[in-house]
Design a protein with these regions (language model features):
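Primarily a LysM-type cell-wall glycan-binding module
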Residues: 436-473, 478-493
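Short acidic DE-rich linear segments
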Residues: 1-3, 492-493
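Membrane-lipid interaction segments
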Residues: 2-443
Length: 493
């Protein structure tokens, strides 16, 4: 017997590939001709970032840059800062995907080593890890209506990553040093911390407002070290096709190539600090919706053969933003006399084995007991127990300070916000097809059935191809499962 049925198409963007790619690069760098020779290296760091990530011909094409920052002493014991920018590209096979597939990537720096060849040339080895995420549209057919049948329906609020867009922000700002400062000779090192603070979504566009903090260590006119801090706001309107007010957005900002220059002036002030360069912004949008799912079904007074499809999604979803604080001890090998420069940046954030793991990179330049300038950096992790997973996240450092707690120990106090779109991973078996294999002969008007405790009324009704509502009414059952062992009456159809 052919049944009249109607079908619905359930669609979702599945994470079809999540891959970490470790990359090691070696470079030989030479300072610009106008810079002094390298006598002693104090600080050599690098950070890598993505400039584009696209899918073509079953491959993900990733392009990016690595900025190398070098602080060194010249022959006159003056501190000099310079930087180098190198390109990189990676091609990753992702298999067969549809034209709806999209991807994005993030970078986590691992380490940077150097070896001096001579006073004009230095070998630099940089290592970092790219995390690639590829999403593709998956759909499955689900029976929505069927004649003379009972369908087990459930409405669930589900969510998936809807899109991911990478865009570039150009920045250019100037800051005047206080008039009572002793001027500025040259920049020694700096750190820029940027984070999104607000997003507003309209049709096909997202407005991202962000805050930037600039920390600069510089030498003054007496060739002594001094510090300056500045904060400013930036904003960007990003075109994101398909996004609307029903979506949520996680905006992740990453430093690109940034340059900080010192400028002396004849005016009555201490000088000017200029910052210019670029940032890269990844907007990951998440869409949630109420979805009607049919888990099971049967035809009254007939045996059926059912087919099911697996549907993976995130359920019980919400945008979670919470504030935290941590105290992290920074252990040194040498005794510390004075902290010259300290900065804290988010390094990585992930959820593994029901734990939220947030890593911070702490960078410290200090004067030791032997009156030498030292630089060290360490990665510190903070763990929290969680019961959910996130589709996307961002860490925002709101403040940090430090205390010298021992001759070789610094205690760093960090306040930060975690913002993520969280939920529970779910996998459902969806009723995709149902066919009659045999029509049953009519049952007696009533049939006795010895039901067990916790047995589902649905399973009993399906077993006898009877009407579940009639069974509940006949036996005064209000719940979906039996609370005790019970003899019940099964109405015939």
């Amino acid at each position: 017997m052919e049944l009249e049925k109607e079908y619905s198409c359930i669609e979702n963007n599945d994470l079809v590939l999540s891959k970490n790619i470790s990359i090691d690069k070696s470079y030989q760098e030479t300072p610009e001709a106008y810079l002094d020779d390298i006598c002693k290296v104090v600080r050599c760091t690098s950070h890598s970032y993505i400039t584009s990530c696209d899918i073509r011909d079953s491959c993900a094409y990733i392009m990016g840059k690595t900025e190398i920052c070098l602080t060194y002493f010249n022959d006159s014991d003056e501190l000099i800062y310079t930087d180098f920018v190198e390109d990189f590209d990676e091609t990753v096979e992702i298999g067969n995907v549809s034209e709806n597939a999209f991807c994005y990537a993030t970078v986590c720096d691992k380490y940077c080593n150097y070896r001096m060849i001579n006073q004009r040339r230095i070998d630099i080895h940089s290592s970092f890890c790219i995390s690639l995420y590829v999403y593709d549209k998956k759909s499955c057919s689900c029976i929505s209506k069927c004649e003379n049948s009972k369908l087990q329906l459930n409405k669930s609020r589900i969510a998936c990553v809807d899109n991911a867009v990478l865009s570039k922000l150009d920045i250019e700002e100037s800051f005047v040093l206080p008039s009572n400062s002793n001027g500025i000779k040259r920049v020694v090192c700096f750190n820029v911390e940027c984070c999104s603070v607000e997003t507003k979504i309209i049709k096909d566009k997202i407005l991202v407002k962000a805050s930037m903090s600039l920390y600069v260590l510089y030498s003054n006119n007496d060739n002594c070290l001094d510090r300056a801090e500045y904060s400013f706001d930036i904003s960007k309107i990003v075109d994101v096709p398909g996004v609307d007010e029903a979506c949520h957005c996680i905006a992740k900002l990453c430093n690109g190539s940034l340059f900080v220059k010192a400028k002396s002036t004849d005016e009555d002030n201490g000088g000017v600090i200029d910052i210019y360069g670029d940032l890269y912004l990844t907007c990951v949008t998440v869409r949630e919706k109420m979805q009607e799912l049919v888990f099971d079904g049967y035809v009254l007074n007939a045996d059926t053969s059912n087919k099911y499809s697996t549907f993976n999604c995130l359920s019980g979803c919400e945008m979670s933003c919470r504030s935290n604080s941590s105290k992290l001890n920074f252990e040194l090998q040498n005794e510390i006399v004075k902290v010259e420069f300290l900065c804290v940046t988010p390094h990585q954030c992930s959820i593994k084995n029901n734990k939220l793991i947030v890593e911070f990179e702490i960078c410290l330049m200090y004067t030791g007991k032997d009156n030498t300038l030292q630089y060290v950096n360490q990665i510190k992790a903070v763990e929290q127990n969680v019961t959910s997973v996130d589709l996307a996240n961002d860490i925002r450092i709101t403040s940090f300070d430090y205390t010298i707690s021992g001759d070789k120990t610094i205690c760093v106090n960090i306040s930060y916000d975690y913002c993520g779109y969280c939920g529970n991973e779910a996998s459902y078996n969806i009723l995709s097809e149902m066919e009659i294999t045999q029509e049953r002969k009519s049952y007696p008007a009533l049939t006795l059935y010895f039901a067990k405790q916790n047995e589902r009324v649905w399973d009993i009704a399906k077993q006898f191809s009877s009407d579940i509502e009639m069974i509940k009414k006949e036996n005064n059952i209000t719940g979906d499962c039996l609370e005790t062992n019970k003899v019940i009456l099964i109405p015939g159809i």
